[in-house]
C-alpha cells in the first residue's frame, strides 16, 4: 500500500520509480512504527480493513499511516517512512545510496540539503518532525536504555539467521522489510520461548542498510524491559562484517489484554 500510494501521488500506474538517468529507484524504508496494537483481537473469518493516508514530510521522503480495522474497532496502527534509493553497483545491496526521482521533485521548492540536515540531526527542532521521524532519529543515535525503561541484559545473547533468496528477498533483490521483524521474533523465541499467547503491542525499527544474498544476519540483544524480556526488549541487527543494518524496540502484551479499542 505504501508504494502504491506513492505511485498514485506521482501519477504512475505502477510503483516503477526511476532516477534522472532512467535507472530503477526504490522507496526504501527508513523506519517502521507499530502502535496501539491489539493483534490478539483478530479472529478467524474476521474482515480486516486497512485505511491508508500518505504525506510527504520532506524531499524524497514519504510517510504512510495505516489503520487496521475489524469492523469499527482499530486493532493496530502502522507508520512507514521511506526515501528513494538506488544501487550504485548492479545487484549489490551494499552500494545503495539516496537518489532523486524527477517525478517526485517536480515543483519541489526544497533541496536535498534539507534531507541531509534531517539525517544528521540538524533541523529546526523535533516538533517539526512526524513522530516516526523523531523515533528514527533517536534510534540512529543509539538506544537510551533509561529513557526506554530498559535494563542492560544480564548476559550476552546473539541469534544468527541466513536469509533464503527464494523466500526472504523481494522481487527487487532486497531482504524484504517485513523479514527483519520476523527475524526479531525468531530471536526472541530462541532466547526466551515467550508464551505463544503474547502479542506485539509496539514495535519500532530504524533501518541503516540491507543484505546481499548469502550474507548472514546477526541479532544482538541491547536491553530488556524492567518487567522482564517478555514485556519488551531492544536489539541491533548487523551483517557478518559488523555493518549495522537496523535497531529495533519491541514491547509485548498478553493476548488476554488484546481486546480492540474504539476508533477515535
Predicted ranges, named:
Residues 1-5, 85-183, 187-193:
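Catalytic strand-loop segment that frames the active site of acyl-thioester-processing enzymes
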Residues 148-238, 242-244:
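Acidic/His-leaning functional-site neighborhoods
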Amino acid at each position: 500500500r505504501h508504494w502504491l500510494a506513492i505511485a498514485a501521488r506521482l501519477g504512475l500506474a505502477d510503483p516503477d520509480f526511476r532516477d534522472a538517468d532512467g535507472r530503477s529507484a526504490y522507496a526504501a524504508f527508513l523506519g517502521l512504527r507499530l502502535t496501539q496494537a491489539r493483534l490478539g483481537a483478530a479472529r478467524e473469518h474476521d474482515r480486516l480493513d486497512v485505511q491508508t493516508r500518505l504525506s510527504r514530510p520532506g524531499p524524497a521522503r514519504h510517510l504512510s499511516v495505516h489503520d487496521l480495522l475489524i469492523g469499527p474497532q482499530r486493532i493496530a496502527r502502522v507508520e512507514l517512512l521511506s526515501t528513494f534509493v538506488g544501487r550504485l553497483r548492479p545487484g549489490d545491496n551494499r552500494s545503495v545510496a539516496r537518489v532523486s526521482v524527477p517525478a517526485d521533485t517536480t515543483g519541489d521548492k526544497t533541496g536535498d540539503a534539507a534531507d541531509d540536515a534531517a539525517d544528521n540531526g540538524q533541523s529546526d527542532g523535533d516538533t517539526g518532525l512526524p513522530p516516526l521521524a523523531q523515533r528514527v532519529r533517536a534510534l540512529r543515535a543509539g538506544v537510551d536504555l533509561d529513557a526506554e525503561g530498559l535494563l542492560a541484559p544480564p548476559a550476552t545473547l546473539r541469534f544468527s539467521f541466513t536469509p533464503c533468496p527464494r523466500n526472504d528477498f523481494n522481487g527487487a533483490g532486497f531482504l524484504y522489510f517485513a523479514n527483519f521483524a520476523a527475524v526479531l521474533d525468531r530471536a526472541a523465541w530462541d532466547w526466551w520461548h515467550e508464551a505463544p499467547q503474547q502479542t506485539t503491542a509496539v514495535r519500532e525499527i530504524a533501518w541503516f542498510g540491507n543484505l546481499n544474498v548469502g550474507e548472514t544476519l546477526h541479532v544482538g540483544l541491547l536491553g530488556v524491559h524492567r518487567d522482564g524480556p517478555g514485556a519488551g526488549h531492544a536489539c541491533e541487527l548487523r551483517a557478518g562484517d559488523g555493518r549495522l543494518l537496523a535497531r529495533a524496540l519491541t514491547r509485548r502484551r498478553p493476548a488476554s489484554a488484546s481486546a480492540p479499542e474504539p476508533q477515535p
